[in-house]
Regions:
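Bacterial N-terminal signal peptides
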Residues: 4-13
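N-terminal Sec signal peptide cleavage junction
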Residues: 14-19
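Short N-terminal segments immediately surrounding and downstream of signal-peptide cleavage
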Residues: 21-43
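Solvent-exposed, acidic/flexible segments
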Residues: 32-36, 40, 50-51, 64-75, ...
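...with weaker cross-activation on analogous glycine-rich loops/strands in unrelated enzymes
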Residues: 35-40, 98-134
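Sec-exported extracytoplasmic/periplasmic mature domains
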Residues: 44, 48-51, 79-87, 94, ...
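Acidic helix-start/capping segments at beta-turn-to-alpha-helix junctions
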Residues: 54-75, 88-112
């Protein structure tokens, strides 16, 4: 998962918040070490096709929802790269937030998880990766 951590550390370089210990033990997600190169390749494949920075709130299908390939933010690169290896961060983040909402940053004044946007927010991804020791 080193490639994912490298991608995430780039995304979170300017993000900080306090993390709490998990209230409910996180679900184990198996990602084999030999997929690291494939995940990095999934990110590389977006070069030239993801052309516009667009942080707009978009209603997405769930699970497996995504903004149009030509648009997105930095977290969408990570989401798509992992999805290329059958790892759906939208579903994983949403399920963990549904069980452990208080463990996630409360920057957006929400009262419950939102599967349309939560997985696209870097502080939420940072929390998820930390909670799942990735």
């Amino acid at each position: 998962m080193k490639a994912s951590l490298a991608l995430l550390s780039l995304l979170t370089a300017f993000t900080s918040h306090s993390l709490k210990s998990p209230a409910v033990p996180p679900t184990v997600v198996q990602i084999q070490a030999n997929t690291n190169l494939a995940i990095a390749d999934g990110a590389r494949q977006q070069i030239g096709s993801t052309l516009f920075y667009d942080p707009a709130y978009v209603q997405l299908t769930y699970p497996g929802g995504d903004v149009p390939q030509e648009r997105g933010v930095c977290s969408d690169v990570v989401i798509r790269a992992l999805r290329s290896q059958k790892v759906d961060l939208q579903k994983l983040v949403h399920e963990d937030m549904a069980k452990n909402f208080a463990e996630y940053p409360q920057k957006w004044k929400l009262k419950r998880p939102d599967s349309n946007i939560d997985h696209r927010r870097v502080p939420n991804l940072e929390t998820w990766f930390t909670r799942h020791d990735k």
